[in-house]
């Protein structure tokens, strides 16, 4: 009797517990699946958002203009693009695959900033495209002009350069000596993040033509040129009364500057980089990398953009055939 009575009761209890455990496992599995699905969706949304926020940087390189290891437009741009692409920062670099203004204008679609390294003045790549490029600038796209690219013709080109980056190299006002300024007093600005005092011998243009009262302009690299930078007779790029007076009065000369446009957008002018080997100076390179990021409205790490050391072999890569 005891076996007959307790046997069925025990079986029912065991079956009930098994069902409960099965339901618990199903519930747990459903919860885990729900959270996993949610996390995957969040990750996908995060990746999509990150892709949407990637800063696209376009590089324009001019045709060859000087001898080997001077005015290496494409090679210089490739150094910058490669360093930025490897930085781990949220950027995407696109170097125009041919010298001159882009044949495929869609490369500018969604661009955050444009880097221009080319022959200046009458040979500037932007001269035939001022109106189209102006539309980009008015939409808030940034711009970086390197070395001779900072030199514009008087008239409409110069006026546009003032609007886009606050200053330009102007014939019969600016000069182009080779010298070794010492940059030991750096301003507090995102472009100087991680930059240490340095000196590089290069062709540093100075006595730029700036907007009135330098409104919106922040000097980034400045120094007082020595008298020997003005030993040449007066000429378009060698000297003039105004620059001689400025140096004689002890006014430090700006060779790199940042510009906040009143209507939105940022510009940066950098007069060095005649000598291709200058890119081997880490601080020289970091200033320009930081400036590219700044004009693209990107946050710059407190130690600046991660900056590679360019060795003797790497500096000879991507050179133009000359």
Model-derived features with residue positions:
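Short, low-complexity, charge-dense intrinsically disordered segments
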Residues: 5-17, 21-24
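Bacterial N-terminal signal peptides
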Residues: 26-39
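Boundary at the C-terminal end of the N-terminal hydrophobic targeting segment
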Residues: 41-46
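Extracellular ligand-binding/catalytic regions of CAZymes and related secreted enzymes
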Residues: 48-55, 79-82, 87, 229, ...
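Helical hinge/lid and interdomain linker segments adjacent to catalytic or ligand-binding clefts
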Residues: 49-51, 58-60, 64-152
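Catalytic beta-strand/loop cores that center a nucleophilic Ser/Cys/Thr
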Residues: 170-263
